[in-house]
Amino acid sequence: MKKKHKRLLITSGIFCFLSCAVFFILTTLKENISFFYTVSEAIVLPNNQKPIRVGGMIVENSVIRSESEVIFQMTDFNKSVMVKYQGILPPMFSEKSGVVVQGKMFDNGTFLADTVFAKHDENYKPKVLK
């Protein structure tokens, strides 16, 4: 086999290997990366009953707690949506703070959350230090 053919074969093999590796890495990341929509984006999405994630800020004086559920308004400062959630809220959940909710959006503008994640900045300090 000539040097030129051998080099072409090795280059082709490396290219195929790298292409397969990139494909598998991206496929795995797609399943694990957690993107979220803004409230404005989520409202205009077609209602296909697939779970989505929506991020925004909790509107001040909107949190209503009962024994079985928590209802609050979430906004992206353009539009807002009412969120209903049954379960234990994260410790950092508070009004005027960031939140990401995972669940389903309904046609009436209500979001039924399965999971609530409290967002915070990278400079988190415990309440003791504040």
Swiss-Prot record:
Pfam families reported in the protein's UniProt record: CcmE (PF03100)
**Keyword line:** Cell membrane, Cytochrome c-type biogenesis, Heme, Iron, Membrane, Metal-binding, Signal-anchor, Transmembrane, Transmembrane helix
One of the protein's GO biological processes? cytochrome complex assembly
Q: Which domain of life is it from?
A: Bacteria
**Which residues does the annotation say bind heme?**
H120, Y124
Q: Which residues lie on this side of the membrane: Extracellular?
A: 29-130
Q: Which residues lie on this side of the membrane: Cytoplasmic?
A: 1-7
Hey, which family's this protein in? Belongs to the CcmE/CycJ family.
NCBIfam families attached here? PRK13254.1-1
State the protein's name: Cytochrome c-type biogenesis protein CcmE
Q: Which gene encodes it?
A: ccmE
